[in-house]
Amino acid sequence: MEQEEEQIDNGNTVISIKDLKKSFENNVVLNGIDLEILKGENIAVLGRSGSGKSVLIKIISGLLKPDSGTVKVLGQEVDKISGKALQALRLKIGFSFQSSALYDSMSVRENLAFPLVRNKRNLKTKEVNMAIESVLNDVGLSQTINQMPSELSGGQRKRIGIARTLIMKPEIMLYDEPT
């Protein structure tokens, strides 16, 4: 059995959480959370408003520190790394938070190009354009490529936000209220 667990830890476990706790002042938000997510799994965390779902995602992504417990993402203990190591890990994690977080002054094309140009600077314009067209097709919004976020419905903005996350081809996707 021990060998089986070791094998899981050596490649199939993408997120491992043990006895996670997080409070804000006297409000306990997460208490004793244990979770293991394997490569290829899709997990939904359900709960009422204020139950800690967003906090859990922020801890997994390294945006918040847990009070105690361990959180490993792709084998790295998230609250033990910082700087370039944390930045490199975050590039492997796609985030889609509650708001679409689109730049209002940029077209859909520019919003989708931004993370590619910022994080993968050696891409040619043709490669960027092909990636944009592909991801827009994936979310069914090819026709919006030249529109501004203010011209889109709330659902369309949400899907463009998801497309902006997918365009980076992350190893892990974290969605906070994806619909």
Spell out what each predicted region is:
Residues L46-R48:
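The feature captures the beta-strand-to-loop junction immediately N-terminal to the Walker
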Residues I162:
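Hydrophobic anchor residue at the start of the ABC signature
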Residues G69-E77:
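Conserved ABC transporter NBD signature motif
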Residues I167-E171, E177:
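A short, proline-enriched helix->beta-strand linker immediately N-terminal to the Walker B motif
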Residues S61:
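Helix-to-loop junction immediately C-terminal to a conserved catalytic motif
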Residues S105-F114:
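Short coil-to-helix segment of the ABC ATPase nucleotide-binding domain corresponding to the Q-loop/switch region
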